[in-house]
Amino acid sequence: MTLLNNKKPLIAHVLFRLGTGGLENGVVNLINSMPDDKYRHAVICMTDYTDFRDRIKKDDVQVYCLNKKPGKDFAVYFRLWKLLREIKPDILHTRNLSALEAQLSGLLAGIKHRVHGEHGRDIDDVDGTNPRYVLLRRLFRPLVQRYIPMSKDLETWLIKQIKVPANKITQIYNGVDISRFKISGDKPVDLLPPDFRSPDLMLIGTVGRLDPVKDQITLVQAFIHLVKSCPDVRNKVRLVLVGAGILQPKMRELSLEAGIDDLIWFAGERNDVADIMRTLDLFVLPSINEGISNTILEAMATELPVIATDVGGNPELVINDQTGYLVPKQDPTAMAEAFKHYLDNQDLLVCHGKAGRARCESTFSLNRMTTDYMNVYDNLLNLSH
């Protein structure tokens, strides 16, 4: 073991792909925030990576690609086994179903300490009951030494649906780098289109890949409903959509058909999300399913009230009528009513925003998350002594 050679332990983080996303952002934040003298890290991508890897600030982190082919590419697990035999990590940490099968390669490569994280579920299994996926998770259950779900909701699901013993689970919330999200100074309105810069406007926004599970379609429909039902608000609100993905053409089509395309800014992918957040007045997360949303935490850290769907881990973040509002998923009318409530009671924007920031500082800090992960890793390694 590397510990016996007086080297820092190596953690191999196995992901399906290193690209834009909440799971990937959480891994990068964890690596960047861990003390340099504590652990070494490697990131193994079952497929490939994008320039998102540049967000890793540590020079000694190796990123590997296994170039998994679409469909059943069983050879990828042999390539993974060879890589693990070469780099000899002390801990293997896989994340989500798409990387779970890497646990077998880890076992065969002789990696004693194996961790699996559950960060959320995909559009084809939003409630976690897909029989094939449940069977696969149960088959691999004996190989995992420690499970780390992001939310209490996922922890309960692991126990009840996947039959994981409670004593093998350590629930850890995502954390946000509060210092990165400024709440003082002038808003950087110069980042916005000219028609979005008036201080009299209420800017509603979201950040995330435009993907069916994120369901920004419902957000656009809710915004259309707000404008159609209250024509006088046309000069009072704007919608900011940060992100790219397969839903964008449909969202543009809806806005054009409704005649409100001039009220929506499709900002695309951005590397200045923290600054864009500061231009907003209200953050919305319309997802069909969520683990623990990084973007909700980032919005709360920016003192933004949050409207989120009442799914997954969202109710563990947003306290209804204190830091924002929870609405049913895929319900544009309910979401539009929440918009209107803030529009009519704008003092709540400040009140709920400040409460959200305080909640981030007390419960969802990056330091707390990092400490919790280090405790898991330390405890696992101590078992070998």
What are the roles of these predicted feature ranges?
Residues 252-268:
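Nucleotide-activated donor-binding/catalytic signature segment of Leloir-type glycosyltransferases, i.e.
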Residues 64, 142-186:
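Donor nucleotide-sugar binding/catalytic pocket of nucleotide-sugar-dependent glycosyltransferases
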Residues 334, 341, 348-363, 372-379:
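A short, well-ordered alpha-helix in the C-terminal region of glycosyltransferases
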Residues 45, 305-308, 318:
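Short hydrophobic beta-strand element within catalytic cores of glycosyltransferases
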Residues 21-29, 202, 206-228, 246-252, ...:
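A conserved mid-protein helix/loop that constitutes part of the nucleotide-sugar donor-binding site
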Residues 269, 288:
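Aromatic "clamp/platform" in nucleotide-sugar-dependent glycosyltransferases that forms part
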Residues 181-198, 203:
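A short helix/loop element that forms part of the nucleotide-sugar donor recognition site in Leloir-type
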Residues 320-321, 325-332, 341-346:
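Conserved acidic donor-binding segment of nucleotide-sugar-dependent glycosyltransferases
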